[in-house]
Amino acid sequence: PFNSRHKGWVRSANNWGQVCHGGLTAGALAVLEDEPELAAQTVHNTLRNVTRSMAVYAPRGSYPEGPAYWSYGTSYNVMLIGVLESVLGTDYGLSMAPGFSMTGQYPALAGGPSDLFFNYADGGSSRNPSPILFWFASRFNRFDWLRGERQRLSELLATTEASRGASNLDRFLPLALLWMKTGPGKPECALPLHWQSGGETPIALHRSSWDDPAATFVGFKAGSPSANHGQMDIGSFVLDANGVRWAVDLGAEGYHGIESRGMNLWNRAQNSDRWTIFRQ
């Protein structure tokens, strides 16, 4: 796959690189004893290229594609690190990539007191449990990054039980059992009230309290609409107060409905249809 005509993902700087390299490496190491040459080639290509995708975490752990795609891309990145360490005994420095050690704080920072995400870029505002947060909390001894995570996990499991397993569960959810460690009952919150991410798609997040459910929270976004999953929403913001989201981001719009109208989302030329659609 590294040399086919569909190899654009190999040097991708977005979540494609994390997802594809993470999945291929997990598969390659699973057959290491039978296909050592293929496994070696796959790992080599991954280590040479996945750092391009991981560069987006710099400098403070934010993610330009928003919280929803953070969970998607970062889950495969954590899995990649996990399989490398499990099989080969090292992650070859991937976990030391600039900003990666801080990215476990990002979902908590990007979530308002309403328990909704600041859903800039192409994602929804709903918060679901993210198993990789247990990995980050254990790895970097920051159990305050798990704010509300156990409660969200309990609610999801209760919903699943009530629906007899019909819920749309995260495929990585079972890994939470491997990554959970016993931490302080209620760890002291070391997260800031005011934070800005830096980077090419900067965001700023401000809140009046971490413990008051009626606290005021505002999130601002800057950057360029040409960013991966970027929308024509530069300068957008969300506002929470008294447990209610008063100012919202419209969130994602399905690709099919747009493309069925004959509009081309993937052309980045000056006069492309892409720049005439607010949410894509």
Which sequence ranges carry the predicted segments?
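Generic structural hydrophobic/aromatic packing signal, biased to beta-strands
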Residues: 24, 46, 53, 107, ...
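Extended glycan-interaction surfaces of carbohydrate-active proteins
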Residues: 1-7, 30-56, 132-168, 198-203, ...
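Well-ordered alpha-helical scaffold segments within catalytic/enzyme domains
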Residues: 20-36, 74-91, 134-140, 144, ...
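Catalytic and substrate-binding regions of extracellular carbohydrate-active enzymes
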Residues: 156-280
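C-terminal, helix-dominated tail/subdomain
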Residues: 91-171
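Aromatic-lined, polymer-binding surfaces characteristic
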Residues: 1-116, 123-124
